[in-house]
């Protein structure tokens, strides 16, 4: 089968764990492969639960540089969208839910996290973004070593899985979704505001294939919905190196 032209194929990437180590900058060899091997062959986009500033830091650039470098940059699950270097669309969870509901959710999370005993706790337990509320039991200001320590304990004890279950039990009919993302946190957002949200920005682009690459593709992970959506061809990866290996095979690079 002949290759489709670049304008008809999109490679769409989660960031943490897919193109970069969690919350770390992209490796130079991964970046060179994406820019020199992949971009000449297909259109390339990013979709992340993080805000644009964090995405840009991980992509080793300023926000302006990164939105110009990629065909599409969907930060905060696509609630903030840039197409070909230009701002396109923005939604607000605060306007959607209202202040009372936002505070009800935040207060529950703070109380729940206050009763957890962990090896360490640091700062920024709740981060309010345009498209979601991010809650972090260990605190987002933890060091890299503390992050890894929490991730190891979480893998054994299911700290975030239990937290997610408590949220689902407390807010069963709220219209909210709760997804485990990255190594240390949970994303809270209105149902349908998961990473699939970015697909509405692609409906008129004429793509015949949208390949999505993510690492949190199991049910409950923040890549699951987009990975399993019938509009995408989902690829589950285990590391940036695995992402490159799969890209080489899929696109014959």
Regions found by a protein language model. Give the residues of each.
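Mg2+-dependent phosphoryl-transfer enzymes with acidic/Ser/Thr/Gly-rich catalytic loops
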Residues: 2-7, 26-27, 189-253
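Short loop/turn segments at strand-loop or loop-helix junctions that form parts
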Residues: 11-16, 76-78, 84-85, 129, ...
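Active-site phosphate-binding/coordination module
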Residues: 25-124
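Substrate-recognition element of Asp-dependent hydrolases with the DxDx(T/V) motif
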Residues: 37-59, 73, 125-137, 180-182, ...
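A generic structural motif
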Residues: 39-43, 173-177, 208, 230-232
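Conserved acidic, metal-coordinating active-site core of Asp-based
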Residues: 119-211
